[in-house]
Amino acid sequence: MSKIIAINAGSSSLKFQLFEMPSEKVLTKGLVERIGIADSVFTISVNGEKNTEVTDIPDHAVAVKMLLHKLTEFGIIKDLNEIDGIGHRVVHGGEKFSDSVLLTDETIREIEEISELAPLHNPANIVGIKAFKEVLPNVPAVAVFDTAFHQTMPEQSYLYSLPYEYYEKYGIRKYGFHGTSHKYVTQRAAELLGRPLEDLRLISCHLGNGASIAAVEGGKSIDTSMGFTPLAGVAMGTRSGNIDPALIPYIMEKTDQTADEVLNTLNKKSGLLGVSGFSSDLRDIVEASKEGNERAETALEVFASRIHKYIGSYAARMSGVDAIIFTAGIGENSVEVRERVLRGLEFMGVYWDPALNNVRGEEAFISYPHSPVKVMIIPTDEEVMIARDVVRLAQ
């Protein structure tokens, strides 16, 4: 039995989950919020009960020390020697990392070198890595990359039709994200279908505030909707998804915004929020749509129709599909979005049952037994994938 902690460090937050392996039993999980901001919040679940403390946590190193202290204080572990490995989520692995990697001074330096590819995420991930290294220097640590799963994409999928030297000199290409989630749900789908992953053509729809679709053939990602950054692809909570690139100088000219300001609009003021005009939360938009709000209805249709189009194109790309998977906050819980996405896919062998679709947050088949293409809901578990990779690489 080993104890593995999975970490997801954001710029002002730290999510954690402690596993007993190989049983994959969750011993505790929690979240530190508002790190470096007044009134930081530390939340930990003990025996299913949430314990919350509001205090000042000036940086990630203090957050890590507090977390480890709480694990012993609540008797979850006797002492720090019980922690056998640490797994860190890292958003961007560039082309360098096509798999998770054991963290050494050299690999940490290499992750720092590709941070310009994910300036909003990687620096925070590295802060988390260094904070744990300081407190637990002798415990093996592993980085698990969001991009790694998509490194199997062929050139025709990842290259942009730009001057080739941009790819050679600057690494400009599609990388894709949510890889750990897409990998988990496609592996789980094969188990639930009782078929070898190598034989399956799967379309995975990770729909949360950020959303991406992946075409997975024989267990390998062959295409995905996000691109060089997580801004590309389908419309999202606050992100635009794909737009005509010529719009950027046009918007700059019309609104007197700088390029950075337009980019901020595309990242934080677009998507469901931009179209609806009032919320990035899908639940609010579904409610407003039911009450007759036309912009809310349009936002829902824009969101669903973009996903619908990716499913069609990826089915064509793989010459068919065996199963469509819905996962993440919206994919697992929104009956309405699944219904809108699936509507009209009967031509490709998708027959789903509205009664079976009336389910939230649990594993389920929502297609009829006779449907040639299965439709599944699989709650994602990125943390358990991180823990598995720590066991695989560190022990």
UniProtKB/Swiss-Prot annotation:
It catalyses: acetate + ATP = acetyl phosphate + ADP. Keywords: ATP-binding, Cytoplasm, Kinase, Magnesium, Metal-binding, Nucleotide-binding, Transferase. Catalyzes the formation of acetyl phosphate from acetate and ATP. Can also catalyze the reverse reaction. SUPFAM superfamilies: Actin-like ATPase domain. It comes from the Bacteria. Pathway: Metabolic intermediate biosynthesis; acetyl-CoA biosynthesis; acetyl-CoA from acetate: step 1/2. It is found in: Cytoplasm. InterPro entries: Ac/propionate_kinase, Aliphatic_acid_kin_short-chain, Aliphatic_acid_kinase_CS, ATPase_NBD. It is an enzyme of class 2 (transferase). It comes from Bacillus velezensis (strain DSM 23117 / BGSC 10A6 / LMG 26770 / FZB42). Its main location: cytoplasm. Mg(2+). Can also accept Mn(2+). Mg(2+) binds at N8, E382. It holds the Pfam family Acetate_kinase. This is Acetate kinase. The record marks H178, R239 as: Transition state stabilizer. ATP binds at K15, H206, L207, G208, N209, G210, D281, L282, R283, G329, I330, G331, E332, N333. Homodimer.
